[in-house]
Amino acid sequence: MDRSTDLDIQELKMTREQYILATQQNNLPRPENAQLYPVGIYGWRKRCLYFFVLLLLVTMIVNLAMTIWILKVMNFTVDGMGNLRVTKKGIRLEGISEFLLPLYVKEIHSRKDSPLVLQSDRNVTVNARNHMGQLTGQLTVGAEAVEAQCKRFEVRASEDGRVLFSADEDEITIGAEKLKVTGTEGAVFGHSVETPHIRAEPSQDLRLESPTRSLKMEAPRGVQVSAAAGDFKATCRKELHLQSTEGEIFLNADSIRLGNLPIGSFSSSTSSSNSRQTVYELCVCPNGKLYLSPAGVGSTCQSSSSICLWN
C-alpha cells in the first residue's frame, strides 16, 4: 500500500512539473502553490569542478609562460634556433658550437672574415670512410702528436696546387724550391741521400759530417765540388787517397806547392858543404814516394836513397 502511494505521489509530481513547464512556455498563469525543483551540480561536486577548472587554468598559464621562456632563451626565429640558421645552402652556425655526439657532414666552411677553429679537450679526429663504412683515412690532432693515417699524405701550395710534400709507403717527396734545416744539430740521415744539388745559405758554411762513420759521395757521371770565391780544403788524420782507375789526376794552378816533403842526402866531391842550399830537385821513388834532393850539376836522385827504402 505504501509503495503504491509513493508511486502515485511521484507521478503526481511529474505531472505538476510538466504542467509548470507547459505554462511557462505558453505564458499561462501558474498556480500560487507551485514548487520548483532545481536541476544541476551542487555541493562538493560543484566545488571539485571549480577546483579542477582552476587547476587546469593555472597549468595552462604556467605552460604558456614556460613556452615563452624557452622560445626567448633558445632564440627561436623563423630562420632557425639560437646560433643555428637554416639557409638554402645548408646550416649556418654563429659563434661557438659544441657537439656532444659524432657529426656527419659533407663540407664545413667558416665565415669569410674569421677562421675555422676545431677544439676539443682531448683530441680532434677526422675520419674518412668509403661507401661500405670502412675507414680509409684518419687525421688525429692530439696533445702530444699529430697523426695521419692514409695511403698517401700530400701538402699542396695554395696558389697553383703544386705538391710541396708527399709521403707514402715507398717514398717521401719534397717539392719545395728549397729545403732549410735550422736545427743546431743539422739534418741526420740514417741511410743514403740522393740529391742533385747541395747548397749552403749565403754567407754561411756548408758542412757535411759523419761523427762516427765514413762519408761517401757517389755519382755515376761525376762529383763536382767547387768554391767560386773561397778555398777548398781536404784534411784527414791518416792517408789521403786520390785515385783514378781509367783516367788521370790533373792539377792545374798558377803554382803547385808540396809542403813537408822529406829531404834526401847526396854526397859529392864537387859539392860545397859550406854553401847554403836553396834549390832542390824533386825525386820520385819506385814506390811512388816523393822527396827532395839537393840540386846539383846533374841529377842527384838516387833510387837507393834511405827515403825510398822506408815503408
Curated annotation (Swiss-Prot):
Residues bearing glycans: 75, 123
Coiled coil segments of this chain: none
GO cellular component: cytoplasm; cytoskeleton; plasma membrane; sarcoglycan complex; sarcolemma
Cytoplasmic side: 1-50
Listed GO biological process terms: membrane organization
Intracellular or extracellular location(s): Cell membrane, Sarcolemma; Cytoplasm, Cytoskeleton
Segments traversing the membrane: 51-71
Intrachain disulfide bonds: 285-301
Major location (coarse): membrane
Domain of life: Eukaryota
Signal peptide: none
Tissue: Expressed in the heart, skeletal muscle and arterial vascular smooth muscle.
Classification via Pfam families: Sarcoglycan_1 (PF04790)
Family annotation (InterPro entries): Sarcoglycan (IPR006875), Sarcoglycan_gamma/delta/zeta (IPR039972)
Keyword field: Cell membrane, Cytoplasm, Cytoskeleton, Disulfide bond, Glycoprotein, Membrane, Signal-anchor, Transmembrane, Transmembrane helix
UniProt membrane topology term: Single-pass type II membrane protein
Residue ranges, Extracellular side: 72-311
Biological function: Component of the sarcoglycan complex, a subcomplex of the dystrophin-glycoprotein complex which forms a link between the F-actin cytoskeleton and the extracellular matrix. May play a role in the maintenance of striated muscle membrane stability.
Family designation: Belongs to the sarcoglycan beta/delta/gamma/zeta family.
Protein name, UniProt field: Zeta-sarcoglycan
